[in-house]
Each structure stands twice: as structure tokens, then as C-alpha cells.
Amino acid sequence: MEITVINGSPRLKKSNSEILKNYLLNFIKENKINEYFSFSIKLDNNIKTNIHNSDILIFIFPLYVDGIPSNLLSLLLNFENKKLINSKTKIYCIVNNGFFEGVQNHLAISQIRCWTKKVNAQWGQGIGVGSGELLSHLKKVPLGQGPLKNLGIALEKFSKNILSLKSDEDICINPNYPRILYFLQANVSWFMIARKNKLKFKDLFKKIYNK
């Protein structure tokens, strides 16, 4: 089976989407895998052929203003205009965000589902991952354990559906981590960044325009 995975994050290899991609690849690595970044992909004839011949097409990307990042959206339109998507191809997606709740990704998943219908392909499933900013801090934690327990369970089910070409209901997950602690750490990180840039605590509350 030929599987194409497209990372839709502008942060490329330094992105949380790349971390999620690598987790997923551990479940599906026995297949032929094509990997691309939507930000830098060049649609030459070889890549066009790979896209068209894919049994599975997986988009992994961050949530941008409740939707799809512009670089990935541009690529989707390109695929659509060039009629690259095979009607037999099954499409899946994983969306992550900086909010605690994974359900915040549901609109972006719906957008990919609608696009799938528009290009006459087959919809598989979507995963909405909350608290994506935690991922880079949990690289030493085994997938499926601790804060990554829910993610491990979701990716295992997701990968089984991929390998069996099965469609299923979308999954939205939160980390196995206290919500209040997540927000506390997020706020502290801003203070640390401010100090690193020689700013004071009060500088974080300055406004460009005063009424």
C-alpha cells in the first residue's frame, strides 16, 4: 500500500505536526511512505504521480484561526485544479492546536472532509489533538503513557483504520494532564520569553493603541 503524508505546518521539521507524523509512522512504516511539506513541495511529475497513485493521503497540520494554514490551503487548491487526487484515494487528517481541548479542531477537520468530497475522493477519519504545544516537551515520555496516554490510544486506532482502509468517526482528545497546569505553564513561558528579550513583566500588557 502506498501512503502519502503531508505536513502542513510552516514550521516544517521543528513543528508539533512533525512530532505527530513521526508517532504515526511507527504504526504504518511497513508500507511505502511518501513524505512532503506543504510549505516547500514542488509539484514535479514524479510527485504528481506519487500523489495520484496513493492509496492513502494523510494531512497533518496545526490549527490556524479555526482553519487550515494558508500554505496547505494553497496546495489543496493546486491538487484540485490539477485533478491530482484519485477517486479511490482515502483521505485522513490529524490537526493539533494550542488550546487545551482537541475538539477545537473540529472545524478544520470538517474543512478537509468537505474538500475530500469536492475532489471526489473517499473520507477516512480525522483526529483533533489538544495542547499541541506540550508535545515538544514530552519527547522522553513513551507514547501511550502519562500525558500521552490518550494520544497513543487514538493513534493506534487511527493507524488500524488506515491500514484497513476503514472510515470511522473523528476523534478529539485532550492530554492526560491538568488543564490548570497547562495554562499556568503557558503563561510562565511568556514571562520567560519577555525576560530573554530584555522586557519587564509590565511590558507584556502594553497596548499599541489607547482609547
Residue ranges of each PLM-predicted region?
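N-terminal beta1-alpha1 ligand-phosphate binding loop
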Residues: 2-30
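Short, solvent-exposed loop/turn segments at secondary-structure boundaries
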Residues: 15-16, 103-106, 139
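Iron-sulfur-associated redox domains of electron-transfer enzymes in respiratory
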Residues: 20, 28, 96-99, 120-122, ...
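Short helix-loop-beta junction
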Residues: 23-33, 114-121
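A short beta-strand-loop structural module common to alpha/beta enzyme folds
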Residues: 30-45
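Helix-loop-strand module that forms the ligand-binding subsite of alpha/beta enzymes
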Residues: 41-120
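Glycine-rich phosphate/pyrophosphate-binding loop and the adjoining helix
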Residues: 127-211
